[in-house]
């Protein structure tokens, strides 16, 4: 957990998205192992609304909603910040992020980052090879060879195919809420078959 907090602190510093209050809270956590355990417990307590969609263990209850389990905590924290400041918009998440203080966001990101993804078999296994080829071509450069994600790129491995499909199609249609994303140019020439195949492949990725 100390390693996760160190990464989270480093990521916040590099992306410069948190204020001084967040930095002070994170430094306090790093200096106090007992506080780290408390932060995890506090994150668990604060997922009252999150768990209705994303599950208590971070595995979504609806296939069009992303898993948060094993997501990079730096990415999660920064996603909260973007929803809170309006850089990203979503009917539910925009309101929820604004209702959480910085400490809550840190604790929730830490909590969900420690959960384990439950990988489910694809309903379209015949698309595996095509999906793998497309993933290797357009996804792995940013999201990792196994879809493990990075500090500024989400983990894809094990995400529901329906969620990935919807997300890619939204990017392809130039979703204005993600206007600055590199994904708009990546998806603009993807066919429905390519989107379905890569989504099917991603759902089965187990790392």
Report residues per predicted region.
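Positively charged n-region of N-terminal signal peptides that target proteins for export
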Residues: 1-4
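N-terminal signal peptide c-region/cleavage motif recognized by signal peptidases
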Residues: 11-14
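Inter-heme linker and motif-flanking segments adjacent to c-type heme-binding CXXCH motifs
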Residues: 59-60, 87-89, 114-126, 141, ...
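Conserved hydrophobic/aromatic "anchor" residues
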Residues: 83, 111-112, 135, 171, ...
């Amino acid at each position: 957990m100390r390693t996760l907090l160190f990464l989270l602190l480093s990521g916040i510093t590099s992306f410069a998205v948190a204020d001084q209050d967040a930095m002070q809270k994170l430094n306090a956590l790093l200096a106090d192992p007992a506080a780290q355990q408390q932060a995890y417990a506090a994150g668990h307590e604060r997922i009252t609304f999150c768990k209705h969609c994303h599950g208590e263990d971070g595995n979504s209850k609806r296939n069009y909603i992303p898993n948060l389990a094993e997501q990079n905590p730096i990415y999660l924290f920064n996603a909260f910040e973007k929803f809170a400041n309006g850089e990203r918009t979503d009917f539910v998440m925009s309101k929820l992020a604004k209702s959480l203080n910085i400490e809550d966001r840190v604790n929730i990101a830490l909590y969900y980052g420690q959960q384990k993804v439950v990988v489910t078999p694809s309903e379209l296994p015949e698309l595996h090879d095509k999906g793998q080829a497309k993933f290797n071509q357009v996804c792995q450069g940013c999201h990792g060879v196994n879809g493990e994600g990075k500090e500024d790129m989400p983990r894809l491995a094990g995400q529901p195919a329906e969620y990935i499909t919807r997300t890619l199609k939204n990017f392809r249609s130039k979703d204005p809420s993600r206007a600055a994303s590199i994904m708009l140019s990546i998806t603009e020439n993807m066919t429905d078959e390519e989107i379905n195949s890569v989504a099917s492949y991603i759902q089965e990725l187990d790392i």
